[in-house]
Amino acid sequence: MIRFIGFYDYTVILTYISLISSVYGITQAIHQDYKTAIFCLAFSGFCDAFDGRIARTKKNRTEDEKNFGIQLDSLCDVVCFGIFPALICYLLGVRGFPGLLLVFFYCTCAVCRLAYFNVLEGNRQQTEGGCNKGYRGLPVTSIAFILPMVFLFQFFMSELAFLSLLHLVLLVVGFLFILDFPLPKPGLKTILSLMGVLAVSVGIILIYTKYRLPPHTDRTSHIVEEVEELFEDIYETETP
């Protein structure tokens, strides 16, 4: 009988879907399809908001299943809400030495927060169990709500102002990831309200970009061309 490592039941399916959505979004961001990338980021945030609730519906979960869920969620969050949004900001123009420092800072803060959360959650599960009632610092999932809101501003402000805003978002949000302050966990009504606002925002982005794509979103075309030329050079070098 063939056996696989890991768990693949309904308690972790949303986490896997969230990861797939973000990986697909990364490919679309590289090809400058930012509206699809933002949609994928928002969808990953939606999945992350409900994966824990779904997992807790299974009453007979083993300790291995619980611990696997905690580790899997954080590892996927590194991609979905750490690397993915930082890449979007980079491709939108957060570059140069200051921009790269902010990208590194944001990713490091996200990873640090998730690792620290795993330690705290593992200890809490052993002593208390059940659902966590609050957060310490800003959850990384919040970027799935913040970045689509920020993305809307590019349609109504200058390129310089928009890029400055992206720099500020990476700095402030990254800092809030690691700042130790109590934050109540939102209830179901609050989550649904935020999802509604997010859905409207993504809808506006999809409709607006269908009729008008801001000129400064073309600024990354040369990046794609340089990457393609690099692979062509490598192929030609290795081909006898």
Predicted region positions:
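Helix-coil boundary and interhelical linker segments in multi-pass alpha-helical membrane proteins
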Residues: 24-39, 79, 83-104, 149-165, ...
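C-terminal ends of transmembrane helices
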Residues: 56-61, 111-126, 175-185
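Topogenic membrane-insertion module of multi-pass membrane proteins
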Residues: 1-52, 174-215, 231-235
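Lipid-exposed faces of alpha-helical membrane segments in multi-pass integral membrane proteins
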Residues: 14-20, 40-43, 79-82, 104-108, ...
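Short, amphipathic, aromatic/basic-enriched membrane-interface segments that mark the entry/exit
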Residues: 3-13, 67-75, 131-136, 160-164, ...
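C-terminal membrane-associated helical module and adjoining short loops/tails
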Residues: 127-240
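Multi-pass membrane catalytic core of lipid/isoprenoid biosynthesis enzymes
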Residues: 11-16, 57-113
